[in-house]
From Swiss-Prot:
This is GTP cyclohydrolase III 2. Keywords: GTP-binding, Hydrolase, Nucleotide-binding. Pfam families: GCH_III (PF05165). It catalyses: GTP + 3 H2O = 2-amino-5-formylamino-6-(5-phospho-D-ribosylamino)pyrimidin-4(3H)-one + 2 phosphate + 2 H(+). The keyword GTP-binding applies. One of its GO terms (biological process) is biosynthetic process. Disulfide bonds: none annotated. Its EC number is 3.5.4.29. Belongs to the archaeal-type GTP cyclohydrolase family. InterPro entries: GTP_CycHdrlase_3, Nucleotide_cyclase, Rev_trsase/Diguanyl_cyclase. It comes from Halobacterium salinarum (strain ATCC 700922 / JCM 11081 / NRC-1) (Halobacterium halobium). Signal peptide: none annotated. The gene is gch32.
Length: 253
């Protein structure tokens, strides 16, 4: 997993005077697009996160390759980025290690930290990145239940609240990293999971937030491979009415 952080961004947004919010939003959107292109071009996944702090699923991408991303950002924007990369047994542990790598390089608002690039693993971990599992969550009938029925504010708070509930549950119980990816969709980078784990997660969200998810799960050597399988599995859910479909499902199910 990778953590991509804009260097000294908070002070930059206010010096020498506070910058226009729309300009900052446009900068963040363009910068994230470059991060997504970089990771996607190498079969990874990118998530906007908080925009000044982005997340990547980077299995199969050499840490040194991120120097190219840093060069691209430096040449195109008035800011730079630092990158922490973590390798661990689970996505949550890997992202925690990536965050540690960034913090060890200096504060997010340290004017002397620029384009840091560091790779970490948890103490005692000596393995290599394994296969990737992606779960793609989609709200059942979001258009009929929310988009065409309630105000945009209500639709947004209901869906994003459900994603937050899902993300906290999967992080706390299964060491997965879940991100909202727009519309009514969320993607979770998971340890290897089974249908029972997914059913428990969706049941928890249904009870806690009142939102019903359908889920496609994929498995592959890279985030792209696993994500593509997950999207195809999700289409099977939409076509059949199943709530969960994944690599454990037989062709006759």
């Amino acid at each position: 997993m990778a953590a991509v952080q804009i260097d000294d961004y908070g002070p930059w947004t206010t010096e020498p005077a506070p910058r226009r919010e729309t300009d900052l939003q446009a900068l963040q959107a363009r910068l994230f697009a470059d991060v997504a292109d970089f990771l996607g071009g190498r079969d990874g996944y990118a998530f906007a996160g908080r925009f000044d702090n982005m997340v990547g699923a980077a299995t199969g991408i050499a840490p040194a390759a991120f120097e190219r991303l840093q060069e691209r950002i430096r040449n195109r924007y008035p800011v730079t980025v630092s990158v922490g990369i973590g390798t661990a047994r689970t996505p949550a542990d890997a992202l925690d290690a990536a965050g540690t790598a960034l913090r060890d390089a200096g504060s997010a608002q340290d004017e002397n930290r620029q384009e840091a690039l560091s790779h970490r693993s948890p103490p005692g971990f000596a393995g290599t990145p394994g296969a990737v599992t992606i779960a793609h969550f989609d709200v059942v009938d979001a258009t009929g239940t929310y988009t065409d029925t309630v105000s945009p504010v209500r639709a947004g708070t209901e869906i994003q609240g459900a994603v937050t509930t899902l993300a906290e549950y999967l992080y706390d119980t299964h060491d997965a990293v879940t991100q909202f990816v727009g519309g009514d969709n969320a993607i979770a980078v998971c340890p290897e999971i089974d249908a029972g784990i997914v059913d428990d997660a969706t049941a928890h969200v249904r009870e806690a937030a009142g939102v019903d998810f359908q889920v496609g799960v994929g498995h592959g050597d890279t985030p792209h491979d696993a994500g593509a399988d997950a999207k195809h599995a999700l289409e099977t859910c939409r076509a059949t009415g199943a709530r969960v479909h994944g690599p454990w499902t037989t062709a006759d199910d």
